[in-house]
Amino acid sequence: MAASGLDHLKNGYRRRFCRPSRARDINTEQGQNVLEILQDCFEEKSLANDFSTNSTKSVPNSTRKIKDTCIQSPSKECQKSHPKSVPVSSKKKEASLQFVVEPSEATNRSVQAHEVHQKILATDVSSKNTPDSKKISSRNINDHHSEADEEFYLSVGSPSVLLDAKTSVSQNVIPSSAQKRETYTFENSVNMLPSSTEVSVKTKKRLNFDDKVMLKKIEIDNKVSDEEDKTSEGQERKPSGSSQNRIRDSEYEIQRQAKKSFSTLFLETVKRKSESSPIVRHAATAPPHSCPPDDTKLIEDEFIIDESDQSFASRSWITIPRKAGSLKQRTISPAESTALLQGRKSREKHHNILPKTLANDKHSHKPHPVETSQPSDKTVLDTSYALIGETVNNYRSTKYEMYSKNAEKPSRSKRTIKQKQRRKFMAKPAEEQLDVGQSKDENIHTSHITQDEFQRNSDRNMEEHEEMGNDCVSKKQMPPVGSKKSSTRKDKEESKKKRFSSESKNKLVPEEVTSTVTKSRRISRRPSDWWVVKSEESPVYSNSSVRNELPMHHNSSRKSTKKTNQSSKNIRKKTIPLKRQKTATKGNQRVQKFLNAEGSGGIVGHDEISRCSLSEPLESDEADLAKKKNLDCSRSTRSSKNEDNIMTAQNVPLKPQTSGYTCNIPTESNLDSGEHKTSVLEESGPSRLNNNYLMSGKNDVDDEEVHGSSDDSKQSKVIPKNRIHHKLVLPSNTPNVRRTKRTRLKPLEYWRGERIDYQGRPSGGFVISGVLSPDTISSKRKAKENIGKVNKKSNKKRICLDNDERKTNLMVNLGIPLGDPLQPTRVKDPETREIILMDLVRPQDTYQFFVKHGELKVYKTLDTPFFSTGKLILGPQEEKGKQHVGQDILVFYVNFGDLLCTLHETPYILSTGDSFYVPSGNYYNIKNLRNEESVLLFTQIKR
């Protein structure tokens, strides 16, 4: 291949190699063709043999330092600040220029030869390939060519081998243990050539260069750094302030340009390396003219530059991670066993680690993964891309905002928190598929989500104490740039890599010269909602058996992942009770509200969610039991209260006959006149306790009938309970059945006079206290007219009836003649002993003397020189007035009403059935307390 056609590549091509600190220098002069030297390097067979030999030996013996790739001391980083490869800027130019930089045609043939594919170890191609999932999937949609037509062959070779070829071609032994490995992974956007216009079928695309003026400036800086490398050869490199200043100056000059190229991004990477940022992931947006018009979101791609001085002289790879061969298992050294145990734990505790804890973890875990590539099992590789790409995307989102000065696409640098979370959670299903590929069991995929959530919730206390203990060691070692979320996600991914490498010990590593990297056809998937609490997926919230297993996980937080997976599978197989599901659903709704409330402020800690969701089923179960108990108690209490009320209403007035207490019974009330009277019934059954006075109409009952009814009531005994409750239907005590709490009644025999007896509650309202049976209800009629007329009519009618009945009975029983009550009676005079006629009988409603004064009425039925009897009627709230009896003696009987009687100076409240008398020479006064008439019978003894 003629080198004259590639003269414009000589400067930029040499800068594509990241030369290590101990690499031999190439003293080039102006006009000297560097491609000739590179061509000789690629054609040297002995060097290729050594290259393959050292690569095979170095893999199993190399100690992988996982965390050293993330955290290096500033001194180590400054030591390697000079021998950086000068960045390559890609630009769309001619289609005839090949994208793969080839020193010679022999190199091109060696790239495609399968034999050489198996002799060079491409350890960092597949695992470090970090394409953006969204960008690659959308780029596959908008691309116009097939997958086979757009393969990118990027076989750069080891720059140290190429550089050493000039000084000593025959040297075969290259030290592999004296150098340290440091990986720089950064994400860049390759300006894709529009395949629809400028790429022919099955073409190899080329790296083109623009901004030659900037590259010349960089070349001058590089030559100065080469001269410094000569002076410091054989010694350990130290930080060079002048080199750093030159790199910063060159970076700032490039950033003044309107658009950023790959070289600009690489200089930023060099600068950040000297500022103790060991892994730099940068997102560079390509110029708009270098991409198809439809690929507005498909611009970004990722480059991984891996400097490794561990196995042989520095191997530097610039890879374009597209769809490539599958990822095989990574090897691990036996010295990692203690670190791997902590690595397993760190994947569950990633959600609540502080940034300083992350820095401590990066220093404490030091195995370095050696990732190999194998052209089989493409599905696992795609998932590994998602795994690594998710880490790079998280870190890039913060680095882009801090360092990227490109303003062409500001919308990408201002993503919302919700979009970042979606990108973060995108790789979670892919991580589970990695575990499926390693164990060859597809069923484990469903259990990983369960296992992650379960073990995070169960081990959080123990792990938080351990992490806080480690925080004291590394308080000052914090990531320089990046938010808490991106650092947390990065720590999670690195712990995933450790766990993945522990499962793949003692695996053979194939050798390849180049890696055929094609476009990835991964489908963009929605982020996994692991943070959403689901009752059916997370057994911690819904399965009652998990509560029994939680102490086991708290006590055995260092168990292996397999045991946890098995336990999670067993938990998933168990059935969930229906009541627990309902309870868990209620708890999950609370947790979801809690998450929504906290969503604007950031990510909610999983320990809070787990505490809420774990305690809520227990609390809800206890609440259900307590609620049922309270319900049962309330029902029983209510029924017992009803019974007590009924018994109180029944038992309080029901006193023995000897006690003399009386209870009130309802009598007939006059709605028109509002006049009332009472009747005396002792031990007459349940009655209203709060109702002292029962309304009644004007008295239409004569004295004899009232006394007769009272006598009948005295003869009746206490009404049994079944007489009171035979109509009541109390609430049933059914724990699991929803029944009414009302006190129901069977149909009442209203035609017999059955009525409901209501009792007033202290809080207001009424409560059914029982049913008034016909035995307790008075059958007295209500008076509708004047008391005189009513009494006359009713009494006359009753007298006639009674007389007829008497006559009938007497005629049947006795055969004697009867006297006329209206006629005087023949009696013997005591003094003269002669027979005289006297009025001894006074029929009803007949009187000898009548006095009316307002509402006060006095009827004298019998009046003799020695005594007189009669009836005193007081109107509603009427007072008789204070009166002196003189020499007479007055005897009173309260026929109906409630009275305030004052005997000389002592007041008394007397009611129906009471009697009192006033001795001679004293005063008395009577006042009606009711709103109806009160009736008293009196007897005056004359002296």
Curated annotation (Swiss-Prot):
**Residue spans of biased composition, Basic and acidic residues class:** 224-239, 438-463, 488-510, 706-715
Q: Region MIF2 homology domain III: start and end of each range?
A: 890-943
Q: Where is the composition biased (Basic residues)?
A: 412-426, 570-583
UniProt crosslink position (Glycyl lysine isopeptide (Lys-Gly) (interchain with G-Cter in SUMO2)): 45, 119, 134, 180, 212, 217, 238, 260, 271, 273, 297, 440, 534, 677, 727, 807
Keywords of this protein's UniProt record, alphabetized?
Cell cycle, Cell division, Centromere, Chromosome, DNA-binding, Isopeptide bond, Kinetochore, Mitosis, Nucleus, Phosphoprotein, Ubl conjugation
Instruction: Locate the Phosphoserine modifications and list their residues.
Output: 73, 96, 146, 189, 225, 261, 316, 333, 376, 397, 439, 528, 538, 684, 709-710, 763, 773
> Where, per UniProt, does this protein localize?
Nucleus; Chromosome, Centromere, Kinetochore; Chromosome, Centromere
* One GO BP annotation of this record: attachment of mitotic spindle microtubules to kinetochore
Kindly state one GO CC term assigned in the UniProt record: nucleoplasm
- Main localization category: nucleus
For the region Disordered, give the residue spans.
70-91, 224-250, 358-377, 403-513, 537-587, 632-717
Motif Nuclear localization signal located where?
Answer: 259-273, 484-499, 558-574, 780-798
Q: Which InterPro entries match?
A: CENP-C/Mif2/cnp3, CENP-C_mid, CENP-C_N_dom, Mif2/CENP-C_cupin, RmlC-like_jellyroll, RmlC_Cupin_sf
The signal peptide annotation in the UniProt record is: none
Compositional bias ranges of the Polar residues kind:
633-672
Q: Which residues carry this modification: Phosphothreonine?
A: T130, T183, T734
Q: Which GO terms describe its molecular function?
A: centromeric DNA binding; DNA binding; identical protein binding
Renumbered residue ranges of the record's region MIF2 homology domain II = 737-759
Question: What CDD domains does the database record attribute to this sequence?
Answer: cupin_CENP-C_C
Please give the record's comment on domains: The MIF2 homology domain II targets centromeres and binds the alpha satellite DNA in vivo. The MIF2 homology domain III can induce CENPC dimerization/oligomerization.
Q: What job does this protein perform?
A: Component of the CENPA-NAC (nucleosome-associated) complex, a complex that plays a central role in assembly of kinetochore proteins, mitotic progression and chromosome segregation. The CENPA-NAC complex recruits the CENPA-CAD (nucleosome distal) complex and may be involved in incorporation of newly synthesized CENPA into centromeres. CENPC recruits DNA methylation and DNMT3B to both centromeric and pericentromeric satellite repeats and regulates the histone code in these regions.
The subunit structure is: Oligomer. Component of the CENPA-NAC complex, at least composed of CENPA, CENPC, CENPH, CENPM, CENPN, CENPT and CENPU. The CENPA-NAC complex interacts with the CENPA-CAD complex, composed of CENPI, CENPK, CENPL, CENPO, CENPP, CENPQ, CENPR and CENPS. Binds to DAXX. Interacts with DNMT3B. Interacts directly with CENPA. Identified in a centromere complex containing histones H2A, H2B and H4, and at least CENPA, CENPB, CENPC, CENPT, CENPN, HJURP, SUPT16H, SSRP1 and RSF1. Interacts with MEIKIN.
Concerning its family, UniProt says: Belongs to the CENP-C/MIF2 family.
Q: What is this protein called?
A: Centromere protein C
- Organism name: Homo sapiens (Human)
